[in-house]
């Protein structure tokens, strides 16, 4: 990071030891025609919260990837409402193959920077359950900014 006032280069502060992944969970996998993307996301979130030993009310940040099988422009907002939480920090990301790593980096920075204490990092989709080429194209078209 550059310091414009003095022209000097400032050392970045390490966040090592300040943030941690404290829980992990997953949903059913495979063809699950009776489950919506939201239901699958909820399964994974509940499992992660149980693994972490924290309550739903303690989640104050949500980062999600886009869901191709669900037409939500801001999946993090739609999921938060579905899951019954009101985060102060939220975003939906799509960075191709780097989405998961990017979400974890942003979550760590948000926690270290004081924007949130517990960030739910979530990716969910239902690609084996009825995602047609038309639905995929429509989802991508409707989600663009």
Task: Show the residue positions of the predicted features.
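Conserved "HGTGT" condensation-loop signature of ketosynthase/thiolase-family condensing enzymes
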Residues: 1-92, 109-113, 123-145
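Flexible, low-hydrophobicity surface segments
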Residues: 116-119
